[in-house]
C-alpha cells in the first residue's frame, strides 16, 4: 500500500489517489483525465 504517488507514476486527475507532496498530476493532453505525476514549479 502506497499512500501517495511518486514522480512518473500514472495518475488520474480527478482521483483520490494523489501524487506526493510537491508533485501534481500533469495531464497527458488538455482535457485528459489521465496523466503522470510531475514536480510542481513553485
Curated annotation (Swiss-Prot):
The residue range of the signal peptide is: none
Gene Ontology cellular-component terms for this entry are: extracellular region
> Which cysteine pairs make disulfide bonds?
4-20, 11-25, 19-37
A matching Pfam family: Tachystatin_B
Keyword annotations: Antibiotic, Antimicrobial, Disulfide bond, Fungicide, Knottin, Secreted
UniProt main location, coarse: secreted
State the compartments where it is located. Secreted
Sorted alphabetically, the Gene Ontology BP terms of this entry are:
defense response to bacterium; defense response to fungus; killing of cells of another organism
User: Is the keyword Disulfide bond in the record?
Assistant: yes
Which tissues and organs express this gene's product? Granular hemocytes, small secretory granules.
Domain notes, please? Answer: The presence of a 'disulfide through disulfide knot' structurally defines this protein as a knottin.
Q: What does this protein do?
A: Exhibits stronger antimicrobial activity against the Gram-positive bacteria (S.aureus (IC(50) is 7.4 ug/ml)) and fungi (C.albicans (IC(50) is 3.0 ug/ml) and P.pastoris (IC(50) is 0.1 ug/ml)) than Gram-negative bacteria (E.coli no inhibition at 100 ug/ml). Binds to chitin (4.3 uM are required to obtain 50% of binding). Does not cause hemolysis on sheep erythrocytes. Has no blocking activity on the P-type calcium channel.
Q: What is this protein called?
A: Tachystatin-B1
Annotated organism of origin: Tachypleus tridentatus
Query: Top-down, what is the taxonomic lineage of the species of origin?
Result: Eukaryota, Metazoa, Ecdysozoa, Arthropoda, Chelicerata
